[in-house]
């Protein structure tokens, strides 16, 4: 096996793992919504979209042949993670400053107008407020956990690209 094949396979395995983790996080959010009754706010839904796009781009990238195709989808994964950072960062800031709201009246119609809100309303339709504090998980709010996941993705995926492109082929 050549070095090119080895590093490309390792990168593809990483993308598949990332996609599975993102889908698991969406599943966890749905569990908390349905089983625990924690209603999602507009920023929660935007974070779900970011996770979904990361998973989709990661799976497509893992299925691509050749370095260039994989790199394009890794760039899309990184872009989706940056969008997730914006949504989760704003949500974490709102939770830290409850006097400010995410503006459910402003964001709700926009988020509810997105295609998945009509196709899968249970998972992608707004039903809560961004200022609602839910019990922390291991000391962090859900928004802080999401922010951590998005930041790690935005750092690790480009690091993987850079590391594997420096290898001699």
UniProtKB/Swiss-Prot annotation:
Q: Which InterPro entries match?
A: DiS_bond_form_DsbB/BdbC, Disulphide_bond_form_DsbB, DsbB, DsbB-like_sf
Family statement: Belongs to the DsbB family.
Give an example GO molecular function: protein-disulfide reductase activity
Q: By what name is this protein known?
A: Disulfide bond formation protein B
Pfam families in the record: DsbB
What is its subcellular localisation? Cell inner membrane
One of the GO BP terms on file? protein folding
**What does the protein in this record do?**
Required for disulfide bond formation in some periplasmic proteins. Acts by oxidizing the DsbA protein.
Provide Periplasmic-side residue ranges.
Answer: 32-49, 90-144
Cystine residue pairs = 41-44, 102-130
PANTHER family from the UniProt entry: DISULFIDE BOND FORMATION PROTEIN B (PTHR36570:SF3)
NCBIfam families per UniProt = PRK02110.1
* Stretches assigned to the Cytoplasmic side: 1-14, 65-71, 164-169
Mind telling me which GO cellular component terms the entry cites?
plasma membrane
Q: Which UniProt keywords apply?
A: Cell inner membrane, Cell membrane, Chaperone, Disulfide bond, Electron transport, Membrane, Oxidoreductase, Redox-active center, Transmembrane, Transmembrane helix, Transport
- Record membrane topology: Multi-pass membrane protein
Q: Where, by residue number, does the polypeptide cross the bilayer?
A: 15-31, 50-64, 72-89, 145-163
């Amino acid at each position: 096996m050549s070095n090119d094949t080895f590093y490309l396979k390792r990168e593809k395995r990483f993308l598949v793992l990332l996609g599975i983790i993102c889908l698991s996080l969406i599943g966890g959010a749905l569990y908390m919504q349905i089983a625990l009754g924690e209603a999602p706010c507009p920023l929660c839904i935007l974070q779900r979209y970011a996770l979904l796009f990361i998973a989709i781009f990661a799976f497509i990238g893992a299925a691509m042949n050749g370095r260039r195709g994989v790199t394009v989808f890794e760039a899309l994964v990184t872009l989706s993670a940056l969008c997730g950072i914006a949504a989760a960062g704003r949500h974490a800031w709102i939770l830290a400053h409850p006097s400010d709201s995410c503006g459910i009246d402003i964001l709700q119609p926009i988020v509810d107008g997105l295609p998945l809100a009509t196709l899968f309303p249970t998972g992608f339709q707004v039903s809560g407020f961004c200022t609602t504090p839910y019990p922390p998980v291991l000391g962090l709010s859900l928004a802080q956990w999401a922010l951590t996941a998005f930041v790690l993705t935005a750092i690790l995926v480009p690091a993987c690209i850079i590391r594997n492109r420096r290898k001699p082929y």
